[in-house]
Regions:
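Beta-sheet entry/capping signal
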Residues: 75, 119-121, 221-223, 256-258, ...
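Conserved alpha/beta catalytic core and glycan-binding cleft of carbohydrate-active enzymes
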Residues: 133-170, 247-391
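Beta-strand-rich binding/interaction modules
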Residues: 482-502
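C-terminal beta-strand-rich structural cap/linker in extracellular carbohydrate-active enzymes
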Residues: 507-526
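Loop/helix patches that line or flank the sugar-binding groove of alpha-linked glycan CAZymes
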Residues: 329-332, 341-484
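Sec-dependent N-terminal signal peptides of Gram-positive bacterial secreted proteins and lipoproteins
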Residues: 4-21
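Short, solvent-exposed loop/turn segments at secondary-structure junctions
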Residues: 45-47, 83, 128-129, 221, ...
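Acidic/aromatic-lined carbohydrate-recognition and catalytic surfaces
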Residues: 19-209, 217, 224, 228-277
Length: 526
């Protein structure tokens, strides 16, 4: 490692503007039209209600596109929007329609068009592992099985849909449930009402190709693939083959089609799934309450550890698929929120967001994360609470009621959006600045870490990201107090600072003073 000396100092930094810094979000360069995006995950049910029924809808998302774009996000992931029996809609009854609670196909067409007009790419959740027990495929298969005599064998020619699922006359484990009125059991790993599909069936493969063609024809830019590890339990080779075949079909229809897959596992297992040649996997190795981002934000690990793990992760994935696009995130709809993991500590919550948005790839922000929204306990409904637009409880301002079984009286730790927008020190404005810095410097997302400089103090780290002729240097300070880093040999200038108290890094005589809990962006002097 290259060696630079860092000296920890105790004085409070004076807010002097460094070279090129404005203290405002950076100017956005002309957008690079590729699949590196800043994604915003939306649970439509709880986001924005356009018609006053208490449930979020597609028109509500469309109304908030300017908000999402101004925040700095240029990609949106919609959690499932297809007809379903549940509030979360992961039990799909029809893959080629919109749940009536959310609107219509025409509403989706309008949303797609408005997203594209604002240079926002729209991806939707695709649940390929299972369907609803109310899906016509499953109903037809069960009706056929119930019609069989005790000694009569299944004939796929009589009912092709029997081949769409896993059926057996034996209850192979506790994830198998009896088909009422028959001698057969079906597999349903997640829930009895979500029977698992048989993805080795050529007919099922063709069904999903038709489904993909339907959505691509309407203008959808990609799919978030749900539960890919569970396509065939414990069979990575089969699962990656399914993913690869499906992805290749999608890009044959739309060459820039994007796919990001859920592989809830450690780094090495995620790397195995990159053998599929699909572009992105969610980086669960860095996420969650015990992930590297949260640990660094709350001081359980330091800057040196964070950047080392980050570089190791990038190298691990790149060895398998050199064209991979990492998909880092902090938490999602299945996890307790960042606010809970960091005990409502505002500085730590901000810093976690800053760390995320300094990482390579396409980061994903869970709606409300930019406000420091809170969840409660292990109940999933409490991880999917209404977006906090304002304190107005009249029901006339688009605020949703949230899932029926959620605890709607949760006291949030931070102000609603309308107040945070006006507060330059808010979590919202921190996130907005972090995103705008990222957009102004495409090399942050696209570059690779090629150098970690030795600065002698583990709480301080300096890295270089580079891509072709472009490069950026990023200095991390994970401690509460400010510090100095001698960088005379690098001929750098500060282009922006992201700090929890809005103070700025100052470069003087080859020594940079960086605030506590800060990320400083530098480039070579021209």
């Amino acid at each position: 490692m290259k060696r630079i000396i860092a000296v920890v100092v105790s004085f409070v930094l004076v807010m002097i503007i460094g070279c090129g810094q404005t203290g405002e979000p950076g100017n956005i360069k002309e957008a690079v039209d590729d699949n590196y995006r800043n994604y915003y995950e939306v649970f439509v049910y709880s986001y924005f209600d356009s018609n006053g029924d208490g449930i979020g809808d597609l028109k509500g998302v469309e109304e908030k596109l300017d908000y999402i774009a101004d925040l700095g996000c240029n990609g949106i992931w919609l959690m499932p929007v297809m007809p379903s029996t549940t509030y979360h809609k992961y039990d799909v009854m029809d893959y080629c329609d919109i749940d009536k609670e959310y609107g219509t196909l025409e509403d989706m067409d309008s949303l797609i068009n408005e997203c594209h007009a604002k240079d926002i790419r729209l991806i939707i959740d695709l649940v390929m592992n299972h369907t609803s027990s109310k899906h016509p495929w499953f109903i037809a298969a069960c009706d056929y099985l119930k019609s069989l005599e005790a000694d009569e064998e299944i004939d796929i020619a009589e009912c092709p849909y029997v081949d769409y699922y896993h059926f057996s006359k034996e209850q192979l484990n506790n994830s198998w449930y009896r088909v009422p009125g028959s001698d057969y059991y079906y597999e349903a790993v997640f829930w009895s009402e979500m029977p698992d599909l048989n993805l080795s069936s050529e007919s099922v493969k063709q069904e999903f190709e038709s489904i993909a063609a339907f959505w691509i024809d309407r203008g959808i830019d990609g799919f978030r693939m749900d539960a890919t590890m569970h396509f065939e339990e414990g069979d990575t080779a089969f699962n990656t083959e399914v993913m690869n075949d499906f992805y290749e079909y999608c890009v044959s229809l739309k060459p820039d089609f994007y796919m990001v897959s859920e592989v809830w596992a450690n780094r090495d297992t995620i790397a195995d799934y990159y053998l599929s040649d699909t572009p992105s996997m969610f980086d669960f190795s860095m996420s969650g309450a015990e992930g590297e981002i949260i640990k660094a934000a709350r001081g359980n690990s330091n800057a040196e550890s964070f950047v080392t793990k980050l570089k190791e992760t990038e190298e691990t994935y790149r060895k398998v698929n050199e064209d991979y696009i990492n998909a880092p995130f902090i938490t999602n709809h299945d996890m307790s929120r960042v606010c809970n993991a960091l005990n409502s500590n505002e500085d730590d919550i901000k810093f976690a967001g800053g760390l995320l948005l300094s990482m390579g790839g396409s980061p994903f922000i869970y709606y409300g994360e930019e406000l420091g929204m809170k969840s409660k306990g292990k109940k999933d409904e409490n991880k999917r609470l209404p977006m906090q637009w304002s304190d107005d409880a009249s029901g006339m301002n688009g605020i949703c009621e949230g899932p029926l079984d959620s605890d709607r009286d949760i006291n949030q730790s931070f102000d609603t959006l309308d107040k945070q927008i006006e507060d330059e020190t808010s979590i919202y404005n921190y996130y907005r600045k972090a995103l705008h810095i990222r957009n102004a410097n495409p090399v942050i997302a696209r570059g690779t870490i090629d150098t970690i400089y030795d600065v002698t103090d583990g709480d301080i780290a300096l890295i270089r990201r580079s891509e072709l002729s472009d490069e950026i240097y990023i200095a991390y300070n994970t401690q509460e107090s400010s510090a100095e880093i001698a960088i005379q040999d690098l001929n750098l200038e500060v282009i922006d600072t992201l700090s929890v108290d809005n103070s700025l890094s100052v470069l003087k005589n080859g020594v940079i003073s960086v605030p506590g809990k800060s990320i400083t962006y530098l480039k070579r002097r021209q």
